[in-house]
Amino acid sequence: MSIKISFKKSISSKTFANLVLFVDEKFNAKLIKKYISNSEFSYVSDLLKTSDLNKKILVFNLNSKKKIVLVSIKKNIKNHDIENLGAELYSLINHGKNSQYFINTESVVNSNKSFIGHFLHGMKLKSYDFTKYKTKKEKRSIDIYIIGKKNNISAKDQLKFKALEEGTFYARDLV
């Protein structure tokens, strides 16, 4: 299973198949109102009233082709916790049929400038799969589109994350 990450400044709202939004730790629905339609907002708000708000990630199936994923962010979250959130999201989307997800960075309520970088790094680390000796190799790929203006990951951070991922994957191959 591989992840392909693409950065976009904006995309037509009609193309959103599966949308990932970030909310505060209390799952305040008012923060996501401007990113989804009114009917979707009322549906998600109703479901939030009956959901277990102690979870970090909630997934709402709007219909057979569209999901909204809400990721809860604590106020003083550390970098390794952000990476764990990304890994948890990957675990949820890995077993589904859908292969396209749109992460809206405008909904990030955290002041950490490298939040998206650490979040994606956690997803990439979780996506590792040792397939060297498997006879049937799975060719499925998950496309992650990062949309919004808060998606600026510096070139230095991208190189750092890539080096960490390659080193980690190499060490896992040796073990």
Language model: regions and residue ranges:
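Short amphipathic alpha-helical segment within the helicase RecA-like ATPase core
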Residues: 1-175
